[in-house]
Amino acid sequence: MSAQGEGGGAGGSGGGGAGSDGGGNAGQSSTGSGTVAVTNGGNSSAKNQLPLTPRFTAEEKEVLYTLFHLHEEVIDIKHRKKQRNKYSVRETWDKIVKDFNSHPHVSAMRNIKQIQKFWLNSRLRKQYPYRDGSSSNLSSGSAKISSVSVSVASAVPQQQQQQHHQQHDSVKVEPEYQISPDASEHNPQADTFDEIEMDANDVSEIDEDPMEQQQQQQQEAQAQAQAQAQAQAQVQSAAAEMQKMQQVNAVAAAAAANATMINTHQINVDQISAEKLTLNDLLHFKTARPREEIILIKHPEATATQIHTIPTQAQQHPMATITAGGYNQQIISEIKPQQITLAQYQAQQQQQAQAQAQAQAQAQAQAQAQAQAQAQAQQLAQQQLAAAQHQQLAAAVQVHHQQQQQQQAAVAVQQQQAAAAAAVKMQLTAATPTFTFSALPTVTAATTVPAAVPVPVATASSGSANSVAVNTSTASSVSINNTSLGGGGGNGATNSSATAADSFEERMNYFKIREAELRCKEQQLATEAKRIELNKAQDELKYMKEVHRLRVEELTMKIRILQKEEEQLRKCSTS
């Protein structure tokens, strides 16, 4: 024990001996059970003293136990829910105190500190019946017991306690609590959070209830270590909460890290287009992909039903699954083992007869699918052609507009320079300040719009005529703005408002263009995906054809074998 706890114990047994004895006798005469007595040292200064309260009676204990059990989810640090906060804890404790004090069986009013202390000790001594004790929760923001340094050292010497044990055999005796008499230590106004000292010796000496005998036997060996751990846990309950949160976060972070570790190389579609990917790149990325996503062609029966989908991770380029060489290699390696010896042919005769019918059906289905796919591809090609024509047309229109805009912009620049000069003259003659100078830089910036606009991309968004209309309208609106801006030459105020409108228009155009570019990219990706699907379908078809051819060969060989057998049988029968 630390010096502080010993000081408290010494003060209790020395100076306040009379008080503690009196409290003990009072409690034991009211009921046969001694639990918590808050006794005052006789020599401590009067202003810091708590009033002397009698011990809890058995009825009061029962009331408190039921209340604790009711609110256990909130007040118990071990079993509480995640979402609780310190305010809910505070309110719950206040509610417990109110319910306890308003209960008919209660003889004396108790305050929150006394009830919390009773909760703590009943948990510590394993007397709280509903759950076996664990670290208890004192960290409710309003009532911090830590400000009163409680030394849980027993004020009564150990021999005296053993006498108590002999007197009340079936009753658990709690050591009496001594508030340390130092005025500096026990000062409710000062918020000094001292450590709570616990004496671990008493825990193992409690008489064993027949109910709890097995528990006690198991726990007695651990009791001292537990009590010390609990003392620390009370001091550090807030820290423990923080640590729990951190641990949870750390675990989550680790899990996320593990998840990301699986896919180390992720190809970003924006960075690498399909054309730029070399074979080496593909081989390099192929090794890094998770095993499940690599498409393996297993058995011909499985492939027909199995639908190949593009993997869910969008940022990995789908081409990374299969290289041209690798895919063919797979097909060849799958086909080779099917060139089987005669003995195996004979073993598989019945199976193969069925399989041929299946294979023919599959081949027909595949042929239909292939035809559909080709039709789709043709449609796609036509659509793309149409879109390209639209793009060219729109680009021509836009080039024309840009030329117009540049001419208008040049005119506008001249007009603005004239206007600026006029405004400067106005400023020199009349001393009224105008905002010309602050507005001028934005004016010159705004006139550069038409050159900066990379318009031809915009049409790619929808391969239809209305996009052309949109572009022409935006372009014309820009040019209108420019001319109006030039016309408002007279004073600086109209000039600045026009520039504001112009910069807004410019921004709008920029965003429209960005949107169009993104749509174009989206379409490119979609067509890329379709192309890949088409390639897969074609490859599968090749594979199926090959398998079918081999099967047909097998069956022809079988037919020959059967014919030879028949001939032999006939010879045998004739002979």
Swiss-Prot record:
Biased amino acid composition, Polar residues: 31-51
UniProt keywords, alphabetically: DNA-binding, Nucleus, Transcription, Transcription regulation
UniProt feature, compositional bias: Gly residues: 1-26
DNA-binding region: 48-128
Main location, first listed in the record: nucleus
Extent of Low complexity compositional bias: 151-164
Cellular compartment(s): Nucleus
Disordered as annotated region, ranges: 1-53, 151-174
Purpose of the protein: Involved in transvection phenomena (= synapsis-dependent gene expression), where the synaptic pairing of chromosomes carrying genes with which zeste interacts influences the expression of these genes. Zeste binds to DNA and stimulates transcription from a nearby promoter.
Protein name: Regulatory protein zeste
Organism the protein comes from: Drosophila melanogaster
Phylogenetic classification of the source organism: Eukaryota, Metazoa, Ecdysozoa, Arthropoda, Hexapoda
